[in-house]
């Protein structure tokens, strides 16, 4: 796992007390409207959805719309589909460049959950806090934009426009669009009994970034210092930051290689919320049962010490730019997990078999006492700092 030197505001002629996360009251994808409320709010959009297009396309082409993270819209010509997603988050780490990378990875992740590996175009949506000084704005916002741009280039796409507005809180997001043939994406509705559930990033990012901020808040740090050291927190924070900035593109490609039946990415509703949403979309009468929870090292202990206030053990803790939850044939899952670790994909990363697909009523649950898999930090050094003079 690559590491990055801690962001030093003074390097950019900012006050040493500058913290990007102070320009929002919510963190990351913890900004999401609760799932049950969202479904009610979207009911009016779902009425007569796609009715106009039926006269052109009938039901021959697969389509997705309201209620899922990505839309799949058949185009009127050429047997192609538009696959598109939009997302935005609030700052979750204090490093502006890495926050830009995380925001971009978070937008692209919904395409990757469809097995799409190529993005044709990105737009960036940026809310600049009106509480920033001119100096803070002029130093920090270019770093965020550079991080977003670099992540887009890593994904093989480019940012061609967007929208920038003033806002009380910093808002970071975008739109990702591609045009695909039917064999270039995987519909998220084909899970069958006997499949297994695979997760491609560990849980606990929200816990890691929260407790990292607690290092500066003695009354909160005192609650957890018996179960975790400052070094543990720093390592978990680094691991969380690099994981959030990592694209799910490799996993998306391997979904095709190993015949994935369905997938979603894990973000603001936590692993259980997203598993439940995916289960509801299945054509077959199945349910998902989660037995294992891979968690960043020491973050499970921190969560327990806090009385499970994060909801980590219950699967409701929000994640930001989390991994893919993939339904794979049982005989393919171990090979998927081995392949994604291969050095041919850069550093190689872990994936875990965390549960099963069984006959059921399109629900998802975590067993009463899931096995917690402590995911140790993978520490290596690699300079991912942009050149200060290039973006300030």
UniProtKB/Swiss-Prot annotation:
It is a peripheral membrane protein. Its cofactor is Mg(2+). Its EC number is 2.7.9.3. The record marks 32 as: Important for catalytic activity. It catalyses: hydrogenselenide + ATP + H2O = selenophosphate + AMP + phosphate + 2 H(+). The active site is at 31. It comes from the Eukaryota. It is found in: Cell membrane; Nucleus membrane. One of its GO terms (molecular function) is ATP binding. The modification N-acetylserine is found at residue 2. Gene3D superfamilies: PurM-like C-terminal domain (3.90.650.10), PurM-like, N-terminal domain (3.30.1330.10). InterPro entries: PurM-like_C_dom, PurM-like_C_sf, PurM-like_N, PurM-like_N_sf, SPS/SelD. Mg(2+) binds at residues 69, 110, 265. Keywords: Acetylation, ATP-binding, Cell membrane, Kinase, Magnesium, Membrane, Metal-binding, Nucleotide-binding, Nucleus, Selenium, Transferase. The keyword rRNA processing does not apply. Binds 1 Mg(2+) ion per monomer. GO terms for cellular component: nuclear membrane; plasma membrane. Its main location: membrane. Synthesizes selenophosphate from selenide and ATP. Belongs to the selenophosphate synthase 1 family. Class II subfamily. Homodimer. PANTHER family: SELENIDE, WATER DIKINASE (PTHR10256), SELENIDE, WATER DIKINASE 1 (PTHR10256:SF2). This is Selenide, water dikinase 1. The gene is Sephs1.
């Amino acid at each position: 796992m690559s590491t990055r030197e801690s962001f030093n505001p003074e390097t950019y002629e900012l006050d040493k007390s500058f913290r990007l996360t102070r320009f929002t009251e919510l963190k990351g994808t913890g900004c999401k409207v609760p799932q049950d409320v969202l479904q009610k709010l979207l009911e009016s959009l779902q009425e007569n959805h796609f009715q106009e297009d039926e006269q052109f396309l009938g039901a021959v082409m697969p389509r997705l719309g309201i209620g899922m993270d990505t839309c799949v819209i058949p185009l009127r010509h050429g047997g192609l589909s538009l696959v598109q997603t939009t997302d935005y988050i609030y700052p979750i780490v204090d490093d502006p460049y890495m926050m830009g990378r995380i925001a971009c990875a978070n937008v692209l992740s919904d395409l990757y959950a469809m097995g799409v590996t190529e993005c044709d175009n990105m737009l960036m949506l940026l809310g600049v806090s009106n509480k920033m000084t001119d100096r803070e704005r002029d130093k920090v916002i270019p770093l965020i934009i550079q991080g977003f741009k670099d992540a887009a280039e890593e994904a093989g796409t480019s940012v061609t426009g967007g929208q920038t507005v003033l806002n009380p809180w910093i808002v970071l997001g975008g739109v990702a669009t591609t045009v695909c043939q039917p064999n270039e994406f995987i519909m998220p509705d084909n899970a069958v009994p006997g499949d297994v559930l695979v997760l491609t990033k560990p849980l606990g990012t929200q816990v890691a970034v929260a407790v990292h901020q607690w290092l500066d808040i003695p009354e909160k740090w005192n609650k957890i210092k018996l179960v975790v050291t400052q070094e543990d927190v720093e390592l978990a924070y680094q691991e969380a930051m690099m994981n959030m900035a990592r694209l799910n593109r490799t996993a998306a490609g391997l979904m095709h290689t190993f015949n994935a039946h369905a997938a979603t990415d894990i973000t603001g509703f936590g692993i259980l919320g997203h598993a439940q949403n995916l289960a509801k979309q299945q054509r077959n009468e199945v349910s998902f049962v989660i037995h294992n929870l891979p968690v960043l090292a020491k973050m499970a202990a921190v969560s327990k010490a806090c009385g499970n206030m994060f909801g980590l053990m219950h699967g409701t803790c929000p994640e930001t730019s989390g991994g893919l939850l993939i339904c794979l044939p049982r005989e393919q899952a171990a090979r998927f997990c081995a392949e994604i670790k291969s050095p041919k994909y850069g550093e190689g990363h872990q994936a875990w078999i965390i549960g099963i697909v069984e006959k059921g009523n399109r629900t998802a649950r975590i067993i009463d006492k899931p096995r917690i898999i402590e995911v140790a930090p993978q520490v290596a050094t690699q300079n991912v700092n942009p050149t200060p003079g290039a973006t300030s």
